[in-house]
Amino acid sequence: MGRVLTAIGLMSGTSMDGIDIAVVRTDGDSIVDRGPSAGYAYDPRFRERLKQGLEDARSILKREERPGTLADLERDLTLRHALAVRMFLQENNILPDNVNVIGFHGQTVLHRPDQALTVQLGDGELLARETGIDVVYDMRANDMTHGGQGAPLIPAYHAALARGLSKVGEIATPVVFVNIGGISNLTYIGAGEEIVAYDSGPGNTLIDQWVEAHAGIPYDQGGMIASEGGVLRELADRYLSHPFFSAEKRRSLDRNDFAPPAAGDASLEDGARTLAHVTAAGIVRSARHLPANPATYIVCGGGRLNSVIMSDLHALAEAEGARVLAAEALDLNGDSMEAEAWAYLAVRSRYCLPLTYPGTTGVSCPVSGGRLAAKPGRIAAVS
């Protein structure tokens, strides 16, 4: 592999609540060190602009189009990322010259894998100018060009983490990493480092939309609202009978593929409780499409902080002989893992290593990806 690089990863997920930042040192294969991490929340007004951006993006037919508010939103989003990077570096006493590359995810506003169309707002050239650091961005597009779904991309990082955990005997295999973000996704690491990955269903997005619409708050903190309700079986079955869960061919999801319940379908508490169950049950049902039954689930993402989701996931997984662990039980950071992954992927991109595989996105062959925006004053190169 190449020399070890210091990379910063930037992630703004489907929950649209803020920017996660993390540092990773890697040669593109092994993870040499996981450094500091932090989160920077968006203010409510900017979150509303992002929601409007989702609506404006519905009319996009080509990746480069920016109808409605999207051009201004992309610039403002990028500048907020640049400010977050500067704050993060200052808070952690890191000089920009000591960072080799930034992996910039941007904000997904449209994802239509059936049309080979994915749009992440984020101006890599502007971010490189504002931070003085090389930026790798737009990492999903090349996968789609080669027949992939454009998601998930994190499995390459999960595989690197699993190698490290297996060496010290901390987990039983096969292991499945579960990321419960707005959408939940699974990464299966089997014998011989076989990697299979796909989206598993709604994560937090339906719960977030439900409680925001009916309680005026952005999310159900810790699952407190859900803990006061009961599972409405008819409503849960309506979601779990969706063809997505039974289809043999797995596909990536957009946050609009599942809609929250109608106002009259449930009380606030019962709705939150039922949707938490759907998240957990969707994970276990989707895992039945894997090559072998998981022995260990490692859970990361914001959903692991919802006690009701985790309780249901423990019960459902244990009924099938699997153990469920939060990332922190293995000295991993469940909040920053996606940002860490984007740092890792940026280094792999710089070394032209694969980001995606046939078993993760359905791409025709292992492919690299990402576009490089060099910091001002030089053409970026890796030596």
Swiss-Prot record:
The protein's annotated pathway:
Amino-sugar metabolism; 1,6-anhydro-N-acetylmuramate degradation; Cell wall biogenesis; peptidoglycan recycling
Do the record's keywords include Transferase?
yes
What is the main EC category here?
Answer: transferase
**Matches recorded under Pfam families:** AnmK (PF03702)
The reaction(s) this protein catalyses: 1,6-anhydro-N-acetyl-beta-muramate + ATP + H2O = N-acetyl-D-muramate 6-phosphate + ADP + H(+)
Molecular function in Gene Ontology: ATP binding; kinase activity; phosphotransferase activity, alcohol group as acceptor
Q: Which UniProt keywords apply?
A: ATP-binding, Carbohydrate metabolism, Kinase, Nucleotide-binding, Transferase
Record carries keyword RNA-binding: no
Q: What is its EC number?
A: 2.7.1.170
> SUPFAM superfamilies from the xrefs?
Actin-like ATPase domain
A GO biological process this protein is involved in? peptidoglycan turnover
Residues reported in the UniProt entry to bind ATP: G13, T14, S15, M16, D17, G18, I19, D20
Q: Function of this protein?
A: Catalyzes the specific phosphorylation of 1,6-anhydro-N-acetylmuramic acid (anhMurNAc) with the simultaneous cleavage of the 1,6-anhydro ring, generating MurNAc-6-P. Is required for the utilization of anhMurNAc either imported from the medium or derived from its own cell wall murein, and thus plays a role in cell wall recycling.
Q: Which family does it belong to?
A: Belongs to the anhydro-N-acetylmuramic acid kinase family.
Its recorded name reads: Anhydro-N-acetylmuramic acid kinase
Name the source organism.
Answer: Rhizobium meliloti (strain 1021) (Ensifer meliloti)
**Gene of origin?**
anmK
